[in-house]
Amino acid sequence: MALNSDYQAFKNVVAARRSVYALNADLPVSEDDIVSVVKDLTELTPDAFNQKSARAIVVFGEKNREVWDAIYDAFDGKVDRAKTDAFAAGAGTVLYFIDRSIIQSMQEQYVLYADRFPVWAQQANGMLQFNIWSAFRSLGVGASLQHYNPVIDEAIREVTGAPASWELVAQAP
């Protein structure tokens, strides 16, 4: 049996997805396109009980620089400045969160599964990260996945205005 062209195209995108660390501010698509991709895939990525606990904030330009300066500062200089500067040199960053208020609501509504909702939320967030990263690859947008949290959580909240109920999961410069 021959696999169809849709599968082959999908497989090619997955196979080509890699961490890109040599970032710059030039995008092959508009910032609005990037935001649309993130919004669309946040809505379309499945999760248990359709809880929709995944959240994302996209920052560009000066706000991107503020995010990476805040990350550097949160570590009191214990991370390599060249590394955070390299991420800040990119066009933007996607910040991935889990909305804990959604999880709490689901736990109250479905008590028998209460201990599973945090696990399912992490799984769904991982799928979202993969979906967006792969979509970026298909658009020629380089990215990587970073995990400076929880050390940076409060600093990121201050820079972005993210609600206290949102738990930072990952950063994709």
Predicted regions: what is each one?
Residues T84-F87, V159-P173:
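A glycine-rich helix N-cap at a beta->alpha junction
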Residues G61, F97-S101:
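Beta-hairpin (beta-strand-turn-beta-strand) motif
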Residues G61, A155-I156, A162:
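Short Asp/Glu-rich motifs
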